[in-house]
Amino acid sequence: MDGYARVGKLEKDLELGNGETLYPGLSYGENQLRWGFIRKVYGILAAQIVLTTVVSSVTVLYAPVNDLLRGNSGLLLFLMFLPLLLLWPLHIYQQKHPLNFVFLGLFTLSLSLTVGVSCANTDGRIVLEALILTSSVVCALTGYTFWASKKGKDFSYLGPILFTGLIVLIMTSFMQVGLFNRMYNMPTTPLACFHKLIQIFFVMTMQMMFPVGPTSVAIYGGIAAIIFSGYIVYDTENLIKRFTYDEYIWASVTLYLDILNLFLTILRMLRQGDN
């Protein structure tokens, strides 16, 4: 009887993967499928990060590219808003191969160019420090989220909190750049209005990337770093528990944006501290 009990316990352990599942209640088969999905997402994410590193390096090291982007405010503004435009077809065609990878590549490329411009205007030592700090934070938060999910912890409650914080962050950027005063003093002719709107959005975008004042940068950067760190935990848990197996593109996009925003926030804070 004791032998039968041991065999039964062994079969149960095999079915549950010796208890080493991603989160409690997940069967052994689902656990294997989920791990395959996670590896696929992180593979795509790694490719995005490599592409961003290469494109940013070219932008920094190849002077004509950097001069072209810095000297053409219209082109830089277009590249800043292009990722927002690409998010719509990327979401629509996320499950249609090869269009999903085409739009993902364009999305990553457009963001990489703007990151390159930010890095080109920053001392190399600061860029390296920001890269090391971001990598450390991402690895620590990712490891913690996997461990916490295995212990049965749930971070779904963070979604509304982080979204509210992000909205407050964006509205703060608008107020810093004086958007509402600029809109109130709009000219009357259509052409002048159009030019004014272009100026507003350009200044607004630059202010969101480079807020003015050391106190403003410290407060803004600290809150932004907390929010994007929270999003890494929240989206990593979504990767573990909630994303379907067909949403590998969208899962990689969310994590990529979390990491990129955290890097730019740390870069901004270190640059201001160095100044």
Stretches found by the model and what they are:
Residues 1-275:
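A hydrophobic alpha-helical transmembrane-helix feature that marks the membrane cores
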